[in-house]
Amino acid sequence: MEEFQGYLELDIFRQHDFLYPLIFREYSYALGHGHGLNRYMLLENIGYDNKSSLLIVKRLITTMYQQNYLIISANDSKQNPFFGYNKNLHSKILSEGFAIIVEIPFYLRLISSLEGAEIVRFYNLRSIHSIFPFLEEKFPHLNYSADILIPYPAHLEILVQTLRYRVKDASYLHLLRFFLHEYSNCNSLIITNKSISIFSKSNPRFFLFLYNSYICEYESIFLFLRNQSSHLRLTSSGVLFERLCLYRKIEHFAEVFANDFPVIPCFLKDPFMHYVRYQGKSILASKDTPLLMNKWKSYLVNLWQCHFDVWSHAASIRINQLSKHSLDFLSYFSSVRRNPAVVRNQMLENSFLLNNAPNKLDTIVPIIPLIGSLAKAKFCNAVGHPISKLTRADLSDFEIINRFLHICRNLSHYYSGSSKKKNMYRIKYILRLSCVKTLARKHKSTARAFLKRVDSEFFQEFFTEEGGFISLIFPRASFALRRLYSGRVWYLDIIFINGLSNHE
């Protein structure tokens, strides 16, 4: 974005956030399409030459304002040469242009907030596994959790009103409002969960921007409530939870809270309330009794219903005890398990035994969802029996083995923090036997006959466990390292969830 800051002539629009003229700049849409506007628009639109023109963008906007367009049927679109290429093409082009333009003020505010601020970068914290050492320390002290699905607003005006706090250009907001309403009327989008999924796939950048704006507005109010009801101030990053003019809006918030939340009980002083947002869900965890969790659940439901006009039912939010229920987080089933231990104490001539049972974080591999992912990828059937996988005929045996080996190592690497290794052994067994059946199918043989025919060293690397590698490298310290390997190991080089592990 830095390289286009001067190109977009942002100095002219910085003072008043005047974004409307940028809609008629062709390079705005080129940026939105990743410099592929000509290829995308002209290949599907028969009748235009190989040069994009500003008239195309103007015609798209003009067409939106035509009254007869709202009643164009599918048959009319086939007869109309302008709509003959793709009936959603103009909406997709404008949505991506809207997204790249409306991100400009947010980017400038982010840059201004970072100026003069010395932020230490810890690259190891980019790893997904870096959150689990924190959970090992905090999670055993928590008792209850609530897994809440964040509802998405069905009314389009809520999305526009959310942007009003940040974007000051009235002309741009009017065009954005008209575009959203026109798009929903013609395609019935942003009304149901299915339509939201379609909208997110057809306009990913625009959908993510609207969704993040809504989530940011919701979390700003929720975190404000949390700070006001807690003895301890919230520890968070200013960049992650950056809010525009938050303290200027405190007076307005006070009026909203007075209407929507008549009473905030003084006993809601919980320094152990933890909040996490993960894949469209809010996770609340607390140390206190279920009464506090029920109070916060009611506040969230009232916040969505009264402030965002989003329907959410309190009965759909379940509060679970962590010692009895697992929490699905980052493709692990995490729970609190009591770890009983007997300690023998000696005091002078007297000795006695102490029973100590501290809580411990228990992380388990989600075996059933993982087998479902393997079955979807054609490594096994629905019950977990390995099957041969279709491969290209020109692949050599070593290339096939390396592909299976790469998948097996990635899964083993990601689930190295599991408390129980038996589930991971079953996943490795499925992948190994699937590899053997794939090779046997390629050579038109059975798995047993193929294993007898090949050399034993052929699968040596594939069938060697990670613990075997450690014992080969460090034979004298193999006992200690094997004990370390049998425990949880968190790696600091994992920056994304494996595709097979991401079963959400």
Swiss-Prot record:
Localization in the cell: Plastid, Chloroplast
GO molecular function: RNA binding
Keywords tagged on the record: Chloroplast, mRNA processing, Plastid, RNA-binding, tRNA processing
One Pfam family from the record: Intron_maturas2
Record-stated family: Belongs to the intron maturase 2 family. MatK subfamily.
GO BP terms, alphabetized: mRNA processing; RNA splicing; tRNA processing
Function of the protein: Usually encoded in the trnK tRNA gene intron. Probably assists in splicing its own and other chloroplast group II introns.
Biological source species: Quercus petraea (Durmast oak)
Domain of life according to the entry: Eukaryota
Protein name: Maturase K
Principal place of residence: plastid
The keyword Plastid belongs to this UniProt entry's keyword annotation: yes
Thylakoid recorded as keyword: no
Disulfide bonds: none
GO cellular component: chloroplast
